[in-house]
A protein has these predicted regions:
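Glycine-rich phosphate-binding loops of NTPases
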Residues: 122-179
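Extreme N-terminal "head/tail" segments of very large remodeling/mechanoenzyme assemblies
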Residues: 1-114, 118, 126-128
Length: 179
């Protein structure tokens, strides 16, 4: 018996509830933006890896281990509303290296597109703009938002509340008893 042939699946939605299409790390955003990394992401699975070199020399370029994969994941969590972007030690190192630095992203939340920018060092206000890209947010500034209001303004808080209360839609195929 082929169980998959029996399932009659209909999509509940065309897009994920939350996804990031672009993440940009800035050394500074004004007067002239200096981009350190500009990372395009796609819906679905994005694999983050760093190739290891054959060179065991401690002065060789960083690769594989200590290449920033965990920091990247922490920055993703930060643009999604987490209050920190690393351990205390790592945040201090980043703030020292990038006192005017920030991370920005194009985020999609419950069908709405947002451009966001969050600081590493100077200033604790984040900036958001609906129906905009990171580039447009930099040009037009967007609205300043405190850390406490950030998830609520983007709709992330309501989405998390729905997840906690079980208000998210379940497809009938997943609730059907197995025979």
């Amino acid at each position: 018996m082929d169980l998959y042939k029996e399932l009659k699946l209909t999509p509940v939605r065309s897009d994920p509830n939350v996804w990031i299409s672009r993440l940009v790390i800035f050394e500074r955003h004004s007067p002239d933006p200096v981009i350190i990394r500009d990372i395009a992401l796609t819906r679905g699975l994005n694999i983050v890896w760093a190739e290891e070199t054959e060179d065991d020399d401690p002065t060789a370029e960083i690769s594989g281990h200590s290449a920033g994969k965990t920091t990247f994941c922490r920055l993703v969590r930060y643009v999604l509303g987490e209050k920190t972007f690393g351990t205390k030690g790592n945040m201090e190192l980043i703030r020292q290296a990038l006192p005017e630095g920030s991370v920005a992203a194009d985020i999609h939340v419950a069908g709405k597109k947002w451009a966001v920018r969050r600081p590493f060092g100077s200033g604790r206000m984040s900036y958001i703009k609906q129906d905009a890209t990171v580039d447009e947010l930099l040009q037009q500034q967007g609205g300043a938002v405190s850390q406490n209001d950030y998830p609520k303004k983007l709709g992330l808080e309501a989405l998390l509340d729905e997840m906690e209360t079980g208000a998210l839609q379940r497809s009938p195929e997943l609730t059907r008893p197995c025979s």
